[in-house]
């Protein structure tokens, strides 16, 4: 009976409030050996891809300190539904990122995106700070062809005003493709957990990230 009960309870952590589809697009233009400018677009759709949950537009500037260390400054304009799924708001974010990369072994790379965000809501006095830390492990299997490798990542959100973690995004498995010389496509499954005022919300996410570099 205990074994049967355990098997019945096993799927409970996998239950989710809904499924989302994310389409993300990165465009970078290199100005010289160190400086690049770009733009990031993000569209997130709710259950059955019927309703827009979030959209983001974000012009960016990147500076390569070394081949294995980048600094980045973003200004993001977005509209999103809150964690409790009760209200929609416009946000303006100023973001500073530190992005180190470590070569672990042949074909294995560990990278981090550490981001500090200053956030304003609806252009008013609602202002706050948030920290996001995302380690990512890439496994490169091929240097040519469409399929290039696999990756996994986990991102933690910490809100300084609430003094607690408010979101987690786990990608247990993603696929890296190279459809063109300057284009990379990442397809992923993401388990998203957000913390509202009274409870955690969970979502299954299927996503695609297109990156173009010139």
Residue map of PLM features:
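Short glycine/proline- and aromatic-enriched beta-strand/turn motifs that initiate or cap beta-hairpins
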Residues: 16-56
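Gram-negative (and chloroplast) outer-membrane scaffold detector with strong preference
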Residues: 60-142
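Hydrophobic h-region of N-terminal signal peptides that target proteins for export
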Residues: 7-16
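Membrane-embedded beta-strands of outer-membrane beta-barrel proteins
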Residues: 25, 58-59, 96-98, 133-137, ...
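Transmembrane beta-strands of outer-membrane beta-barrel pores
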Residues: 41-47, 75-81, 102, 116-120, ...
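Outer-membrane beta-barrel "beta-signal"
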Residues: 98-100, 177, 202-214
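Residues that define the transmembrane beta-barrel architecture of outer-membrane proteins
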Residues: 19-21, 53-55, 90-94, 125-133, ...
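Repeated loop/turn-to-beta-strand initiation elements of outer-membrane beta-barrel proteins
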Residues: 34-39, 67-73, 105-110, 143-148, ...
